[in-house]
Amino acid sequence: MSEHVLPAEGPMRFISPIIQDNPTGWGPYEMPDQFRDMPYQPFSKGDRLGKISDWTMVQDKKYQNKYASQFGAGSSYAYFHDEDESTFHLVDTTRVQKPYQSYQRGRARGQRGRGARGARTPGGMTTLNKPRERKLGKRWGQRGAPMKIRDASVTVRPTWVTIEDMDFPRLAKLSLPGIKEGEDIVSCGTLEYYDKAYDRVNVKHEKPLQRIDRIFHTVTTTDDPVIRRLSKTAGTVYATDAILATIMCCTRSNYSWDIVIEKIGDKLFLHKRDNTEFDLLTVNETSVEPPADDGNSINSPRNLALEATFINHNFSQQVLKSGPTEPKYKFQEPNPFVSEQEDGEVASVGYRYRKWILNNGVVLIARCEHDAVMQGPQGETQFLTIKALNEWDSKLANGVEWRQKLDTQRGAVLANELRNNSCKLAKWTVQALLAGSDQIKFGYVSRAQVRDNSRHVILGTQQFKPHEFAAQINLSMDNAWGILRCIIDICMKQKDGKYLIMKDPNKPLIRLYDIPDNTFESDASEESGDEQADTPFAPLYSYGNSKRV
């Protein structure tokens, strides 16, 4: 083998680099040619790339050094404000007083959709949501605004004995399915035909509401001659459609009301007290902000109820074809409440006395009402229930402007009425179902001027089938029958006597009282001797009595 011998290398030489001496500082003082005219920005490898928004200049108030950079990154894009005297001008700093209500609504919108625990405002303050606010308020002993105390419909006397309290959550779970359609026993009265020209009324072609001088009879159960006659041969429970609707829809009510129940043997008579506000229509009863209870205002609950009743009576008669030559629909018997002494014209109304079997020997007989009739598509006769919704002041009622929305967004208007008048609409629907009406027709009536509650205009009409409308407003007739049957069973277990069921004015429950037999009899005799001006309708409208419109 031969060995390879590497050639010998020469001695290594050190080549000294070119050193640039900078007598005034450190580092090179000349820019190499390959780096000349090249832009440069100080940076840190921990910084994110991007220049659309430089967040490195943001300082967290809790952690001051959270975004801090020791390399001066982003300083070339930082904004430094220089005062410009040329654009300086005075600004009017006068505070404008804003309505309290609008301010609250704005705050609610601003906080909606934020986190469950709270949200941070631009000023750095954390806002709590409502449940957390209430929880902290209770912890520290804080109290909110005082709850509005409503008056009871009747003063509870010391001699009354409370039998049972029935709260709304329990009543809402009751159900009595399988109740068949009512059977007609007696039919009375005369009905006029509906004028279909009012179906074409709209906001642009409104019609003024007229005052129709007709007599309305609001006779209670025990004063009805037909019910007195039927009680001898049929039925165990007797009432009117208005009384039944009030009981069946009690879970939707906020205002106080009362119904007198008399038990005689195995029979129950449900009736209302004389000269009360039972027949007045509530306005915005279920609204988040109900009308303020100011007796001097035209927008107080009582004055609004009088106005709504006035509108309903006149509207239900104005939309009919009235006149001596117009055809009329007559039932088998005449109106049982018309006497020979009455000199006025009686309103168009038909009475149906119907029977329902509620099982276990309970047979209900009730007087129901129709307002009009009309010809159906196939020429058949259809019975109508006619009611009117009234607009009083959309700003105070937290509603929508009917004149702006009614023609284009009628569904929104009706949805708002369902929120504000859920109890009233449910009672109207129950009355139409009990009477067997084929259609329920609503009229939209508004004030001609917001501050004038004596002049009104008709802005439109809308028609529904009662069963379809009941499903739309989530009204369960099985639950309604269950509530009625529950109250009937409790009363049937009591001894013979007089009882009163009353909605608590400030709690979601109804109470059943055992009252003396002579209760309200002395009140009726005293009220019968009062002047005519003390009737419920006298303060607003020049009615001769509580039955005339």
Curated annotation (Swiss-Prot):
Annotated segments matching region RNA gate: 277-291
Localisation per UniProt entry: Cytoplasm
Family assignment from sequence similarity: Belongs to the eIF-3 subunit D family.
PANTHER family hit by this protein: EUKARYOTIC TRANSLATION INITIATION FACTOR 3 SUBUNIT 7, EUKARYOTIC TRANSLATION INITIATION FACTOR 3 SUBUNIT D
Compositional bias segments (type: Acidic residues): 523-533
Function statement: mRNA cap-binding component of the eukaryotic translation initiation factor 3 (eIF-3) complex, which is involved in protein synthesis of a specialized repertoire of mRNAs and, together with other initiation factors, stimulates binding of mRNA and methionyl-tRNAi to the 40S ribosome. The eIF-3 complex specifically targets and initiates translation of a subset of mRNAs involved in cell proliferation. In the eIF-3 complex, eif3d specifically recognizes and binds the 7-methylguanosine cap of a subset of mRNAs.
Protein name: Eukaryotic translation initiation factor 3 subunit D
Listed transmembrane segments: none
Disordered: annotated span: 101-130, 521-549
HAMAP family from the UniProt entry: eIF3d
Principal subcellular localisation of the protein: cytoplasm
Record has RNA-binding as a keyword: yes
Assembly and interaction partners: Component of the eukaryotic translation initiation factor 3 (eIF-3) complex.
Domain comment quoted from the record: The RNA gate region regulates mRNA cap recognition to prevent promiscuous mRNA-binding before assembly of eif3d into the full eukaryotic translation initiation factor 3 (eIF-3) complex.
Keyword Protein biosynthesis part of the UniProt annotation: yes
Stretches with biased composition (Basic residues): 106-117
Organism: Bombyx mori (Silk moth)
Keywords: Cytoplasm, Initiation factor, Protein biosynthesis, RNA-binding
GO terms (BP aspect): cap-dependent translational initiation; formation of cytoplasmic translation initiation complex
Molecular function GO labels: mRNA cap binding; translation initiation factor activity
Entry's Gene Ontology cellular component terms: eukaryotic 43S preinitiation complex; eukaryotic 48S preinitiation complex; eukaryotic translation initiation factor 3 complex
Pfam families to which the protein is assigned, alphabetical: eIF-3_zeta (PF05091)
Gene: eIF3-S7
